[in-house]
C-alpha cells in the first residue's frame, strides 16, 4: 500500500563530504587504461572494491619516468552500458610513497572537463563534486605526478541523491546527528529489528551522543542501540593495542571522505589501523566485513565492560566455542532514566575464519590464550551526590587475534538475546544463512526500500525529499524487538519499584502465542516512551505502516498482562516509569478506532487501560483528580490526563460501553 503525501518540509542546504544514501556505480562500468604494468595491476583493479591496499588491488600504469623527468602521463576510463547520472567522483591514489598521482583532469562523455588538484599521496580519498551529469563514460587523465608506474587504487562514482530510483538513496543519515540521542543514528538495523549497530564516536546518551558527524574518531561499533539499553562493542585493530586502557586507547581516527552511510549499510576506514569496516544487518544479527589493507597482527576486540552511552556493562562471562565462535553474557546497569536495575544480555559472535588465539582482559589485568573470562563486577557512581548519576565500571572483554595479509577479509556476525546464550545462537543460526556480505546488504536495503516506500512523495526539491525520507527513517528507529526467533522473551516486571527503577526483579521467561501457521501473533518491544506521540507518531504509523500500531498495542497490553501496568517506555521486558500519565492509551485507542486492532482483543485492551486509568495504575492519578477533575498545581498533567480519559471514552463508546464512555467523558472535562 502506497500513500502520496503532498506536504513537503524544507531543509537548509548542507554539504556532507561523506556519502549518505547513494550507491557507488563504478563497479558496473568497464575499465580501460592507456597502459598497465602487468596483470596484477590492470585497469580492472580500479573499480574492484579493494581500496588503499599496499601494492595490491590497484591500477598501475606502465609509465616510466625517463631521465629528462617528463613522464608520459597515463589515463584510465570507465564506460557504462547505458547512460548514468553522476555528481561525485572519489579518487584514491596508490598508497605507495614511490609513485604519486598528484593531479589530473576528469573528462566526461558530455564534453565537459573538471580539473583535479591536490590528490593525497597516501591513498586518502580525493572527493570531486559537481552538478549532476548524464554520461556514458568518464576518463581521468593524469597531468601531474611523481615517480614511475603511477596509477590509482580506486575510482568510485556516485549519482546524486534520488537518482538511484529507490528510497534508501533519498536518506541522509548524517542529518542532525549533532543533536540526537544515542539511538538516533543506527545504520546496522532493520525496521524494528532486534540488533541495532552503528559506529560510536561520542560516548554519551544525549545531545549528539552515539554517532556525531562532527567527530573525528571511532570508539567502537556497539551492537545494541536501544532506549536505555546498550552493549557489546566490537572494535577491529592492528598492531600492539593494550585494551585495559579502554576506548581512549583503542579508538581510531576516520575521515568522512570515503565514508558511506545508508539505512542498512555503513562503511568507513579506520585510519590508525588501515582497516575498512563495512556493516549491515538482518532482523536479529549484525554483519561485518573487515578488509585489511596491509600485513599485520590483527585483533578484533569485544568490549563487555564500562559505560556505554545509556548503560554500564559489567559482570562479563565469556567462553570460547571452538576456533570460530565466542559466546557469553554481561549485565547492564545505570539506566539514567530508570528501568530494570539490571538487564542481562546474552550474545554469540561468529567468525568466518578461525582465529589464531583468544586473549582477554578484566580491569588492568591481561590474559593470553584463554578459553574463558570473567569480567569485572565493580561499579562506581560517577556523581555520588546525584540520584540519576551515570555509573562506571572497568573495561573487560576478549580479543580474537589473526595474522592477516594485505587484502585479507574477515567476516563477523553478532547476535544477542535477553533470555539465554542458546537463544542468541538460535537467532544467529536462523538469520546467518550465508557469508555473502553483499547479498545480505542487498536484502537489508530491499527491506528498507519496502518500508520507506510505503509513503511516496512527488514534487518539491531534492533537499526537501532527502529531509522527508530521512525523517521517515528516524520514525522507524529507536524501537526494537526483544523476543527471540523461538518466541521467548524476558519478563522483568516482577520486582520492587524504587523511583523510576525496578529492583529485586524475579526474572521470568515467557513465550509468545503463535497463530495457526506457527508465526508469533506479535512481537515484544523495547521502546522510547510514547509521551505525546498522539501528535505525530500515532498518526504517521497509521498512515504508512498500519501494522505497527497494532503490533505496539498488542505488545503494550501483554506487558500489562505480565506486570499489571501498561508501560510508558518499556525496557527489555520491564518498566522505566519515564515521563507521566498513560501515554500508551492514545496509541492503543487510535489503533482500535482506525480498525487496525487485530492482534489483541479490543475488550481486553479496554479493560486493561481502564485499570491503568484508576489510582494505582500507570496514569498516576489519585483521589484528588477523581474528585476535582484536575491535577493540583500542574496544568500540563491535567491536560494530559484529561486527553487520555477522553481518548478512552471514545473507545468505550465504540465498544457499546455506555456507562464507561460517560464516566471517562465526564472525567475529561
Located regions from the model:
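Extracellular beta-strand elements of beta-rich domains used
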Residues: 89, 155-157
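Bacterial N-terminal signal peptides
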Residues: 7-15
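Accessory carbohydrate-recognition regions in carbohydrate-active enzymes
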Residues: 161-586, 593-639, 643-669
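Short beta-strand-plus-loop segments that form exposed binding edges in beta-rich domains
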Residues: 141-148
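Disordered, acidic Ser/Thr/Pro-rich linker "stalks" and the adjacent N-terminal cap
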Residues: 21-86, 92-100, 104, 118-120
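Extracellular carbohydrate recognition and processing domains
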Residues: 113-131
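Short strand-edge motifs at loop-to-beta-strand transitions and within beta-strands
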Residues: 76, 124-128, 398
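Short, conserved beta-strand segments of beta-strand-rich sandwich/propeller modules, principally
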Residues: 88, 137-139
